[in-house]
Amino acid sequence: MTTLTITRPDDWHVHLRDGDVLADTVRDISRYNGRALIMPNTVPPVTTTEMALAYRERIMAAQPQAHFEPLMALYLTDNTSPEEIRKAKASGKVVAAKLYPAGATTNSDSGVTSAKNIYPVLQAMQEVGMLLLVHGEVTTHEVDIFDREKTFLDTVLAPIVNDFPQLKIVLEHITTADAVTFVQQAGDNVAATITAHHLLFNRNHMLVGGIRPHFYCLPILKRATHQHALVAAATSGSKKFFLGTDSAPHAKGRKEAACGCAGSYTAHAALELYAEVFEKEGKLENLEAFASFNGPDFYGLPRNQETVTLTKQAWPVAESMPFGSDIVVPIRAGENIEWTVK
């Protein structure tokens, strides 16, 4: 039986939501991850240090595994102040701030309307060493949804990278060959997370033979050529790419609807899904760097000391999973996953 032992991984981009669902989402994310960076687009969004610390307490109250530490992020708005950034940095619990272009994704209506509005904040982040996390899509109606990422790179991110050369930036959940190239050509202060579902699927999986709402996420799945570029980047061993699931649960009825929500739930089996991709590419030896080394190295945090073991042993995913008083349909529901984590 094939086994692979790696340093305990981290998830550098996950949505846990809030309220009674935390018991379920925290259970899944803490099963084998050492740390997870918790996204702040809750309702209301986590816009202050006090809100971030209170949210962290609610996460810890949901009784994660003892080895797990939640890392917090601030939600940037047009009104975020440099003083708030300094306060967040001083807390020792908030490690990043997130740029959501207004209206780009779930609960992002309070986001930034123009990057220029937060330039004083970005300057403060550069000064104190706080990372900028970026949802890389424009939201103007004239830009096709499949082109939102490339347009963002050209019109928004490139100027930020140029104007703040010492600011560490993570381009989150990249979905295009254009983003891969952008990150590869940028300096060492620019990196990217890649999700399991963008490695495993392309837009055909979502649209051919009927609409499959559980594959609907933002940024949206792209054509296969972009998927192949993401797989090549993730499995390459490059230190610029690391694991961020963007696991984003919604209740089944919110997904299977006339106007369904964006987000795919993968926290139930994230490392196992990534292992399938790396095995298919013949690059299992690079999984540890992607899952366990590149993220903490970029964030300036120590690597985890413990290990986890993956075993090539298939197991069936449930058709649905508990989600507070409701249920969530996970990726690969009713199908087998080829790897098991012990």
From Swiss-Prot:
Residues annotated to bind Zn(2+) 2: 98, 135, 173
Annotated binding of substrate, by residue: 15-17, 41, 135, 218, 250, 262
A single BP term in Gene Ontology: pyrimidine nucleotide biosynthetic process
N6-carboxylysine carried by residues: 98
GO molecular function: dihydroorotase activity; zinc ion binding
Cofactor note: Binds 2 Zn(2+) ions per subunit.
E.C. designation(s): 3.5.2.3
PROSITE patterns attached to this UniProt entry: DIHYDROOROTASE_1 (PS00482), DIHYDROOROTASE_2 (PS00483)
Active site per UniProt: 246
Reactions catalysed: (S)-dihydroorotate + H2O = N-carbamoyl-L-aspartate + H(+)
Listed CDD domains: DHOase
Signal sequence, renumbered to the chain: none
Homology family: Belongs to the metallo-dependent hydrolases superfamily. DHOase family. Class II DHOase subfamily.
Known role: Catalyzes the reversible cyclization of carbamoyl aspartate to dihydroorotate.
SUBUNIT field: Homodimer.
Protein name as it appears in the record: Dihydroorotase
Organism of this sequence: Vibrio cholerae serotype O1 (strain ATCC 39315 / El Tor Inaba N16961)
Gene: pyrC
